[in-house]
Regions:
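Catalytic alpha-helical scaffold of carbohydrate-active enzymes acting on polysaccharides/glycoconjugates
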Residues: 1-73, 77-127, 148-174, 179-200
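Surface-exposed cleft-lining segments at the edges of enzyme active sites
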Residues: 70-71, 136-146
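Glycine-rich, positively charged active-site loop/lid region within alpha/beta enzyme cores that binds
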Residues: 121-141
């Protein structure tokens, strides 16, 4: 990323960064943009509107207290609720969310309130270069080498396209999740997944 002058986004869960604060501070020190992945890798489905609002604000506060900066992006485990995007906009500090799987290109959210200085951006999430494909027996990746090659090819293609079209695209590398077991042990690795390619 440094070689190409690209920015990167760390999509992190609040509990994960609280468990490993040095990693969160290091990401910021290295210039990573911080995006919130929720409190844990969980869906807000089933929460009341007020519970979801608190879930969002608590997640933001936890990340900001560790990293020293607030997250500017959001992507929770699907499915999100009918309230999620509106609550993110009302919270006021998010530039974009990635709770969409319906397109390859980003877009402005048409219902962004007119009093905002800039429209809210929907930056669709792609499962194509996500570790989700490890879970598919027929179309999955049996080896790390194959997955790495696939991701590198996708990155190279997107990088070339950005240079030609000047469009913003999103790329995901392998994402590992923190999980807390019943015994209180933590398993997994810090989730660092996103590169924004703007062609600027």
């Amino acid at each position: 990323l440094r070689k190409h002058g690209a920015t990167a986004t760390a999509n992190i869960c609040a509990e994960a960064v609280q468990l490993y604060p040095a990693l969160g501070r290091d990401l910021v020190a290295r210039g990573f943009e911080i995006s919130c992945h929720g409190r844990r890798w969980e869906t807000p489905l089933g929460l009341t509107e007020e519970e979801e609002r608190k879930w969002i604000t608590d997640s933001v506060a936890a990340i900001e207290s560790v990293c020293g900066v607030r997250p500017v992006g959001w992507h929770c485990r699907c499915p999100h609720t009918v309230n999620t995007r509106r609550l993110l906009i009302e919270e006021g500090g998010f530039i974009y969310d990635s709770d969409a799987y319906d397109d390859d290109l980003p877009r402005f959210f048409a219902d962004t309130p007119s009093d905002r200085s800039q429209p809210h951006v929907i930056l669709p999430y792609s499962l194509d270069t996500n570790d989700m494909r490890y879970q598919l027996a027929a179309a999955g990746f049996p080896t790390a080498t194959q997955f790495t090659e696939y991701c590198c090819d996708a990155f190279d293609w997107l990088w070339d396209e950005v240079r030609k079209t000047r469009r913003l695209r999103r790329f995901y590398a392998k994402n590992d999740h923190f999980t807390k077991t019943g015994s209180g042990q933590t398993q997994g690795k810090l989730k660092i997944e996103t590169c924004f390619l703007s062609g600027r």
